Amino acid sequence: MNLQILSWNVRGLHERDKRLQIKNLIRMWRADIICMQETKMELITRGFVRSLWGCHYVDWVYLGSLGASGGILVMWDSRVVENLEEAVGHYSVSCRFKNVGDNFEWAFTSVYGPNVDRERRLLWEELSGLHSWWNVPWCVLGDFNVVCFPTERLGTINFTQAMHDFLDFISVHGLLDIPMAGGRYTWSNSVSRSKIDCFLFSPNWEDHYPKISQRRLAKVVSDHFPIILEGGAIQKGRRPFCFENMWLQVEGFMGKVKNWWDSYQFQGTPSYRMAMKLKALKADLKKWNELEFGNVVVKKNTTVE
């Protein structure tokens, strides 16, 4: 199945005219899951959700704001995903979803990160605890209020401890941060720009959605750009890639793999470069296997028969 997820810091949902604009945009974007950060709403009702997303099949879960600060709303089309379990933390809203079309189970988290360094560490602890609890493929997104690299904030040249902590979180959980089409930054005002909103996901989540991409949309009614993640699932009946032990018996195999690996050159974050190199290696292994052995699946089936 194909899946579209929208993430957007809307900077408040109190104004009726603003909600009407957002409703029209939601209708145009046609996402399956919609996440809004900084709602500034302490209470969200079904009627309020309907004022944003007119879909009869919409379901939702939210984290209320503290007065006029913060707040997260996650909405989804229940014809596309079923919510098996949910967890509302101090900085995040999470759901354990099951796809209606193919029964794939995965975890989903929308984040609104704090601006204070000592609180950010509580965010990483909150997310890490959730990941170990559910232990399924994971997609985490939102406004983290921190960047990974100095290049992601205009005018910044040095790493900060907050950046190192964010990178450590990404590395520990093996998350991928793929390039974003449509623009470099996700937040801007008259003098500053930064990429503080993003999608991250685990490799086993990407395995199910191998044609994944993220794109920045036009900035309207907020100083944050909406971003959308679009993914196509594995076609039904497609055999997952797996390493064949017989390859190790081929003379020069390990040297060939090393030469392939050293030849791959990609630009981006360390996790993205690693993911792209693994994809390239998988493609080369498949081509080499067909030349060296033919179709392994056919041979195995023939042997059984």
Q: What is each PLM-predicted segment?
A:
Residues M1-E305:
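A shared catalytic/ligand-binding motif for oxyanion handling
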